[in-house]
UniProtKB/Swiss-Prot annotation:
<feature type="binding site">
    <location>
        <position position="622"/>
    </location>
    <ligand>
        <name>ATP</name>
    </ligand>
</feature>
<dbReference type="InterPro" id="IPR009080">
    <property type="entry name" value="tRNAsynth_Ia_anticodon-bd"/>
</dbReference>
<keyword id="KW-0963">Cytoplasm</keyword>
<dbReference type="GO" id="GO:0006429">
    <property type="term" value="P:leucyl-tRNA aminoacylation"/>
</dbReference>
<dbReference type="InterPro" id="IPR009008">
    <property type="entry name" value="Val/Leu/Ile-tRNA-synth_edit"/>
</dbReference>
<keyword id="KW-0436">Ligase</keyword>
<dbReference type="Pfam" id="PF00133">
    <property type="entry name" value="tRNA-synt_1"/>
</dbReference>
<dbReference type="GO" id="GO:0005524">
    <property type="term" value="F:ATP binding"/>
</dbReference>
<dbReference type="GO" id="GO:0004823">
    <property type="term" value="F:leucine-tRNA ligase activity"/>
</dbReference>
<dbReference type="GO" id="GO:0002161">
    <property type="term" value="F:aminoacyl-tRNA deacylase activity"/>
</dbReference>
<comment type="similarity">
    <text>Belongs to the class-I aminoacyl-tRNA synthetase family.</text>
</comment>
<dbReference type="InterPro" id="IPR013155">
    <property type="entry name" value="M/V/L/I-tRNA-synth_anticd-bd"/>
</dbReference>
<dbReference type="InterPro" id="IPR002302">
    <property type="entry name" value="Leu-tRNA-ligase"/>
</dbReference>
<dbReference type="Pfam" id="PF13603">
    <property type="entry name" value="tRNA-synt_1_2"/>
</dbReference>
<feature type="short sequence motif" description="'HIGH' region">
    <location>
        <begin position="42"/>
        <end position="52"/>
    </location>
</feature>
<keyword id="KW-0648">Protein biosynthesis</keyword>
<dbReference type="Pfam" id="PF09334">
    <property type="entry name" value="tRNA-synt_1g"/>
</dbReference>
């Protein structure tokens, strides 16, 4: 064994061994308990970033640990390979998205291997290959036949820069989430999948997900947004149609003083024909689409349509306004306004001088003061005719019943969730498998024409999709009739909604899934990824699983038992102000810093001498130029060091602050482990451990070894607090470094301890552990070695610490044998100087003894 730890030599050797032996390739084995560990698949952007490294290290630690428990562990990897960035990069680099993507996959695959992740590479898949997306296309046609897919023209969020549709979730502050361009509204035909048909199940089954973070479940609950209320129909004077509104507060109905409709509502359009102010307002609304999240904070604006609706219970005429806070795609595109009891309605009414009528009493039974704000709490009705005196629930039911009896109301369950629009006007995605015949009939692409292959040899102009620009591509024939293919492609969330299931049978050619293999491995035991996916990917992922279940492919209700959302990786961020006042961000690698005595950065400059402004730690990003290249760190310190730092620096679900000093610390620790094994093995063979012949000190050290095994097992397995597991191993290493190594049993004990340490570290730092296991002559490869088991007998304490009090005040702490009697403990306590001086010349009136813990002497 060489004396120095040289990761650059051992890591490549061990990785080659894994490749040659196909160590991590698995097949279904009914005799073994399975464990499916999955990290969210990466987008092949070109290089791994530290966020990837953190996600995949957590997954690999869990997978290797479960493997050492004797389970049949599947840990696959693949590439979420379609998507917009490839198109931009292709234009910029004068290439096509396909070669750019495949080059990136090859490069990033090497990076993943360099980090030593134990993946089953035989199952690798890329979602941009026809072998993958053909089954997605086939499944889509099946959903169409079941009535779960439809096409309709809808107002969409359009990014003029990316030339594509954005989901509501992808609009942030009225701008595109990707390129920050102002989003426009546009009407285009789109394909939708009926996720709303599964809304109740998606909501109710959240209760089955005991091992998902509450934050994610709450976000999904709110996104699905189930509510119970009443749909109410109003007659409108001089208008051919009625207006329907939905309310969850029918108890406030007697306080409704105006209605508000969306700018796109037919009533507003009709009124605008003779109202230039309203027409201009509608245009303004059309061009300033906001995501629902911004609704609460934006300025509320409106224009009176001139129409009057009739309140069905009071007969009063109330004005109908067009307002920018009503969305056409939510509910009916019209809302009833109760300014006395809804703050938004109150602000709007105050701004435009509309009537505010209170109908709910304050909590103390007095009439509410509405001079400053609405009273939004529920309470007892007044000012409401026959409903006066009713509380919220009674009023809800009484008013709902009355409206229903009159034929102008109906109880309804509503959802915020909208159907999933899956059409994208981009090229680099899976073609949507639908065709339009000459007579206008729309139908699914026949099975014998699947997959509809996306041509990869294309020229990108950066504006129009090549399959839209080439009229020949769309031409086909169906049943001998000319037809045109759909030229939109799928939202890339389609591919990432079912990849986890395809990993169970990536070579299967008879269909989307081999049910036998899928049902052996599914559901996923732990799924690891960022919380930013809570409402898009993780909802579609659950939805797709239910669709596949209902198609008879899988027999479970949910795709993943546990979800672990890893925290972000942060790094120092610095900038200097340029000549034009712009911020020039400087990489932390290039910043020369001065720190105070507490290690805080007080001054910084770059190599060119610019004084730098330090903005603190923030998420690693291109925009702040504060990303740290994992490859540089691996080349400098080795993969094991980077992995160990990632798992030690912070709990897995919390943010991690990148500190190179911490990486250096992890590297020093691994050098110490190497050195201890080197010194131990240099002394030659080791005798068998005889536990009965150990001295008290040896027993104490062995107790520490086995207590550490117990703690690390609990920390990795049950608690998933990997940082505390590493801390416990480090603490044990400190004790082992000081332990005597001269005697035969000293060395035998050291052998047992080091074999345990190397196995406990193996999930975190597999290359060094593989090598040290061989040097320690462990049985076989460490990859097949069992996890160490704590010896209960070894952990039994011979002695215990007893706190000694005199009149309730702690005077000493004494160590006594665990089987010591009360008399022996009292005798031992009396020998302590600090106890004896308080007993001198006084009488012990009472003794309180809690065996093995506390002795309290009451004196007087």
């Amino acid at each position: 064994m060489q004396e120095q730890y040289r990761p650059e030599e051992i890591e490549s050797k061990v990785q080659l061994h894994w490749d040659e032996k196909r160590t991590f390739e698995v097949t279904e084995d009914e005799s073994k308990e399975k464990y499916y560990c999955l990290s969210m698949l990466p987008y092949p952007s070109g290089r791994l970033h530290m966020g990837h490294v953190r996600n995949y290290t957590i997954g690999d630690v869990i997978a290797r640990y479960q493997r050492m428990l004797g389970k049949n562990v599947l840990q696959p990897i693949g590439w979420d390979a379609f998507g917009l960035p490839a198109e931009g990069a292709a234009v910029k680099n004068n290439t096509a998205p396909a070669p750019w993507t495949y080059d990136n996959i090859a490069y990033m695959k090497n990076q993943l291997k360099m980090l030593g992740f134990g993946y089953d590479w035989s199952r690798e898949l890329a979602t941009c290959t026809p072998e993958y997306y053909r089954w997605e296309q086939k499944f889509f046609t099946e959903l169409y036949k079941k009535g779960l897919v439809y096409k309709k023209t809808s107002a969409v969020n359009w990014c003029p820069n990316d030339q594509t549709v954005l989901a509501n979730e992808q609009v942030i502050d009225g701008c595109c989430w990707r390129c920050d361009t102002k989003v426009e509204r546009k009407e285009i035909p789109q394909w939708f999948i009926k996720i709303t048909a599964y809304a109740d199940e998606l909501l109710n089954d959240l209760d089955k997900l005991d091992h998902w973070p509450d934050t994610v479940k709450t976000m999904q609950r709110n996104w699905i947004g189930r509510s119970e209320g009443v749909e109410i129909t109003f007659n409108v004077n001089d208008y051919d149609n009625t207006l329907t509104v939905y309310t969850t507060r029918p108890d406030t109905f007697m306080g409704c003083t105006y209605l508000a409709v969306a700018a796109g509502h037919p009533l507003a359009q009709k009124a605008a024909e003779n109202n230039p102010e309203l027409a201009a307002f509608i245009d303004e609304c059309r061009n300033t689409k906001v995501a629902e999240a911004e609704m609460a904070t934006m300025e509320k604006k409106g224009v009176n349509t001139g129409f009057k609706a009739v309140h069905p219970l009071t007969g009063e005429e109330i004005p109908v306004w067009a307002a920018n806070f009503v969305l056409m795609e939510y509910g009916t595109g019209a809302v009833m306004a109760v300014p006395g009891h809804d703050q938004r309605d109150y602000e709007f009414a105050s701004k435009y001088g509309l009537n505010i009528k209170p109908v709910i009493l304050a909590a103390d039974g007095s009439e509410p003061d509405l001079s400053q704000q609405a009273l939004t709490e529920k309470g007892v009705l007044f000012n409401s005719g026959e409903f006066n005196g009713l509380d919220h629930e009674a009023a809800f039911n009484a008013i709902a019943d009355k409206l229903t009896a009159m034929g102008v109301g109906e109880r309804k369950v509503n959802y915020r969730l909208r159907d999933w629009g899956v059409s994208r006007q981009r090229y680099w995605g899976a073609p949507i498998p639908m065709v339009t015949l000459e007579d206008g009939t729309v139908m699914p692409t026949p099975d014998d024409q699947l997959p509809v292959i996306l041509p990869e040899d294309v020229v990108m102009d950066g504006i129009t999709s090549p399959i839209k620009a080439d009229p020949q591509w769309a031409k086909t024939t169906v049943n001998g009739m000319p037809a045109l293919r759909e030229t939109d492609t799928f939202d890339t969330f389609m591919e990432s909604s079912w990849y986890y299931a395809r990993y169970t049978c990536p070579e299967y050619k008879e269909g989307m899934l081999d049910s036998e293999a899928a049902n052996y491995w599914l559901p996923v035991d732990i799924y690891i990824g960022g919380i930013e996916h809570a409402i898009m990917h993780l909802l579609y992922f659950r939805f797709f699983h239910k669709l596949m279940r209902d198609a008879g492919m899988v027999n479970s209700d949910e795709p993943a038992k546990q979800l672990l959302c890893q925290g972000m990786v942060l790094a120092d961020a610095f900038y200097y102000v340029g000549e034009n006042g712009e911020r020039n961000w400087v990489s932390p690698v290039d910043a020369i810093v001065e720190r105070d005595e507490k290690g805080r950065i007080v001054k910084a400059k770059d190599a060119a001498g610019h004084e730098l402004v330090y903005t603190g730690m923030s998420k690693m990003s291109k925009s702040k130029n504060n990303g740290i290249d994992p490859q540089v760190m691996v080349e400098r310190y080795g993969a094991d060091t980077v992995r160990l730092f990632m798992m030690f620096a912070s709990p897995a679900d919390m943010t991690l602050e990148w500190q190179e000093s911490g990486v250096e610390g992890a590297n020093r620790f691994l050098k110490r482990v190497w050195k201890l094994v080197y010194e131990h093995t240099a002394k030659g063979d080791v005798a068998a451990l005889n536990v009965d012949a150990l001295t008290e000190d040896q027993k104490a050290l062995r107790r520490d070894v086995h207590k550490t095994i117990a703690k690390v097992t609990d920390d990795i397995g049950r608690r998933q607090t990997f940082n505390t597991a590493i801390a416990a191993i480090m603490e044990l290493m400190n004790k082992l470094a000081k332990a005597p190594t001269d005697g035969e049993q000293d060395r035998a004990l050291m052998q047992e301890a080091l074999l345990a340490v190397v196995r406990m570290l193996n999930p975190f730092t597999p290359h060094i552990c593989f090598t040290l296991w061989q040097e320690l002559k462990g049985e076989g490869d460490i990859d097949n070695a069992p996890w160490p088991v704590a010896d209960e007998k070894a952990m039994v304490e011979d002695s215990t610490l007893v706190v000694v009090q005199v009149n309730g005040k702690v005077r000493a702490k004494i160590t006594v044998p665990v089987d010591a009697t009360e008399e022996q403990v009292r005798e031992r306590a009396g020998q302590e100087h600090l106890v004896a001086k308080y007993l001198d010349g006084v009488t012990v009136r009472k003794v309180i003894y809690v065996p093995g813990k506390l002795l309290n002497l009451v004196v007087g």
